[in-house]
Amino acid sequence: ANEGAYIYIPKNVEVEKPIQIINFTTGNDVATMIQPRNLIVVEENAHVQIIERHQSLTDNAVLTNSVTEIFAAKSATVDFYKIQNDKDNASLVDNTYIEQKSNSVVSVHTFSFGGNITRNNLNFYQRGEHIDSILKGITIIEGKQHVDHHTLVHHIEPNCESHQDYKGIFDARSTGVFNGKVIVEKEAQKTNAYQQNNNVLVSDKATINAKPQLEIFADDVKCSHGCTIGQLDSDALFYMQQRGIPKKEGKALLMYAFANTVLESVKIPEVKQRINKLIAAKLGVHIGFDL
């Protein structure tokens, strides 16, 4: 299909195996633009895991402008994994909108490892109480690649939570943006919102622009945000070299450890294994175990 996917999960249904949405782009000798739209409806007390991948099979320029809408009904659970590891000729603008009802849990993990320009716009709207929204991501890029993460969590009603944790590793002349926004409305008392963005610049020519934002109109909330930008711990790297670990492998291990907090929350073993392999490939080393 070239128009996206429609996924409907009925009430009280738990889908045993993950559903995959794989976007293949082919072309002859011309640049290609595609605009898929995915609609995912998960009814009350239903549970589903979804994996989305983008893959270009052409050497010509490709632009994908995608929209995904997820509606999670009362007590629904959705785990969504985005794997972005495309060629340098491919660019992606990914727009995801999620509406949650009471007692629902939705997690979105975004793994950005390739492509020319990637922009992830991720928007959560909490329309009920006791909702949990989880946003996590890992970015590892090099060359002149660019990745944007723009997130929004809109707390509209009381007694809800959101958790954001994004890690970035930038090499060569790569650039990145993290713009995370949390809005807590006046009625959304007892909100618990956490936002953290940590970045490592492997090259002194790499750039990351980070802007965590909180807009709080309620007075009984627990909200925090933070951002760090730095380089690998030279002391830790020296310590590893003193114990016989080559510098290249030592750097890889430090980066694995840096990203591990995001990988820990991946619930599908095959996805976790694949992401581990992608990280190792991006770092250019072979590590004989998973962290």
Feature locations, PLM:
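Conserved beta-strand/loop scaffold segments within soluble protein domains that form the structured core
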Residues: 1-238, 242-245, 259-291
